[in-house]
Amino acid sequence: MTRNIIIATATAALIGLGALPASANSVWLDQHGYSNQAGGSQSGFNNVIGVLQNGVFNGAISQQNGHGNTAATGQQGYNNYSNTYQQGNYNQGGVGQFGSNHTTILTQDGNGNIAAGVQVGNGCSANIDQAGSGNVAAFVQTCP
C-alpha cells in the first residue's frame, strides 16, 4: 500500500513538473558594466522578456499582460532607457539602442502587433503606441 502511494505521488509530481514549462513565462537578463537596472512584470502565459545591457547607467522595464508576448531590449553605451508595455496577446516588440542618452517607450495594446526599432548616436527619443490588432511599426534613428 505504501509503495503504491509513493509511486502515485511521484507520478503526479512528474506530470505536474512536465506541464509547467508549456505555460510558463520566461525572463532573461545579461547586464555588463555597472549601475544597469532592469525590471518587469508578467501576467498570463508564454510571455518572454529579454534584456541585454552593455555599459553603465542603462535601464529597461518590460510589462506584459496576456499570452504569447515577446519584449526584447538591447542597449549598448550609457544612460539609455527603454520601457515596453504589452497588453493583449501575441505582440512582439524589440528595441536596440547603441550610443548614449537614448529613450524609447513602446506601448502595444491589442493582439498581434509588431514593433521594432534602432537608435544610434546620442540623445535619440522614440515613442511608439500601437492600439488595435495587426499593426506593424519600424523605426531607425541616427542622432548626432
What are these regions (language model features)?
Residues M1-I7:
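Positively charged n-region of N-terminal signal peptides that target proteins for export
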Residues I7-I15:
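Hydrophobic helical h-region of N-terminal Sec-dependent signal peptides
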Residues L17-A24:
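Sec/Tat signal peptide C-region and signal peptidase I cleavage site
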Residues A24-P144:
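Low-complexity repeat regions of mature extracellularly deployed or surface/particle-associated proteins
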